[in-house]
From Swiss-Prot:
Tagged with keyword Protein transport: no
Gene Ontology annotations for the cellular component aspect, listed alphabetically: extracellular region
Free-text description of this protein's post-translational modifications in UniProt: Contains 4 disulfide bonds.
SS bond partners: C3-C24, C9-C29, C13-C31, C19-C34
InterPro entries: Scorpion_toxin-like_sf (IPR036574), Scorpion_toxinS_K_inh (IPR001947)
Protein name from the UniProt record: Potassium channel toxin alpha-KTx 6 hetlaxin
Annotated keywords: Amidation, Disulfide bond, Ion channel impairing toxin, Potassium channel impairing toxin, Secreted, Toxin, Voltage-gated potassium channel impairing toxin
Family membership: Belongs to the short scorpion toxin superfamily. Potassium channel inhibitor family. Alpha-KTx 06 subfamily.
Coiled coil: none
Pfam families per the UniProt record, alphabetical: Toxin_2
Amino acid sequence: ISCTGSKQCYDPCKKKTGCPNAKCMNKSCXCYGC
C-alpha cells in the first residue's frame, strides 16, 4: 500500500490484516499491533 502519511495506512491495515496500528515507511504502509 503506497502512502505519503501514516493516516492513509490505518484503514487499509485494518481491512487487510486487522491490525490497529500502522506507519508509513519508505512510502509504503507497515501494519503492526496485530
